[in-house]
Amino acid sequence: MALSDADVQKQIKHMMAFIEQEANEKAEEIDAKAEEEFNIEKGRLVQTQRLKIMEYYEKKEKQIEQQKKIQMSNLMNQARLKVLRARDDLITDLLNEAKQRLSKVVKDTTRYQVLLDGLVLQGLYQLLEPRMIVRCRKQDFPLVKAAVQKAIPMYKIATKKDVDVQIDLEAYLPEDIAGGVEIYNGDRKIKVSNTLESRLDLIAQQMMPEVRGALFGANANRKFLD
């Protein structure tokens, strides 16, 4: 039985409605999927940027912390250097004061003579040369001459060697030093400095750990003494 025009139109409308509905559903599905992908991508981008921002500020924070440590280390080093300089200045002042007091030793002739006797004899023992020359301040000549005369027989007995010891009459030690002697071998190429200043410097160097300990206390970081 043939369909009437009305039936045909009705079926066409029904098919059109079905196609339209399916198209709408497909479009909605595409929109939903697109929105889902968009949200996923947006979330990924947001998370990526968030991580980048966090990483940036963490890096900045580490840089600032490192700069703080460096600045603190520099400040501590500067403070430590200031303390060391102040300590060295104090020790230098004490040594200078001690050198100034050496003049008092020289004024006591008896005491100074005993000191010269020891310095001359010690210098002879250090050189152990067959011929030696003793140099002194011009004003100390009589005392040094007496010291040399005492030292020669003591040296000969101790070393069992003959020796020729002369006092330098061509050159004297500067008058502005505290005193003491310098002793040379025969050709003046080897010298033993036994001036009062050189002896004080030697003693100060040998006793520096004790001096520092007495002034500033023991150094907890130091394992050995000089």
UniProtKB/Swiss-Prot annotation:
Which PANTHER family does this one have?
ATPASE H+-TRANSPORTING V1 SUBUNIT E1A-RELATED
Q: How does it assemble?
A: V-ATPase is a heteromultimeric enzyme made up of two complexes: the ATP-hydrolytic V1 complex and the proton translocation V0 complex. The V1 complex consists of three catalytic AB heterodimers that form a heterohexamer, three peripheral stalks each consisting of EG heterodimers, one central rotor including subunits D and F, and the regulatory subunits C and H. The proton translocation complex V0 consists of the proton transport subunit a, a ring of proteolipid subunits c9c'', rotary subunit d, subunits e and f, and the accessory subunits ATP6AP1/Ac45 and ATP6AP2/PRR.
Q: Which GO terms describe its cellular component?
A: apical plasma membrane; clathrin-coated vesicle membrane; cytoplasm; cytosol; endosome; extrinsic component of synaptic vesicle membrane; microvillus; vacuolar proton-transporting V-type ATPase, V1 domain
Q: What does UniProt note about where in the body, tissue by tissue, this protein is expressed? A: Expressed in brain (at protein level).
Q: Which family does it belong to?
A: Belongs to the V-ATPase E subunit family.
An annotated GO BP: proton transmembrane transport
Q: Name one GO molecular function term.
A: ATPase binding
Per the record, a Pfam family? vATP-synt_E
Q: From which lineage does this chain's organism come?
A: Eukaryota, Metazoa, Chordata, Craniata, Vertebrata
Membrane-protein topology = Peripheral membrane protein
What protein does this entry describe?
Answer: V-type proton ATPase subunit E 1
Q: Which UniProt keywords apply?
A: Acetylation, Cell membrane, Cytoplasmic vesicle, Hydrogen ion transport, Ion transport, Membrane, Phosphoprotein, Synapse, Transport
Superkingdom of origin organism: Eukaryota
Question: Residue positions of the PTM Phosphotyrosine?
Answer: 56
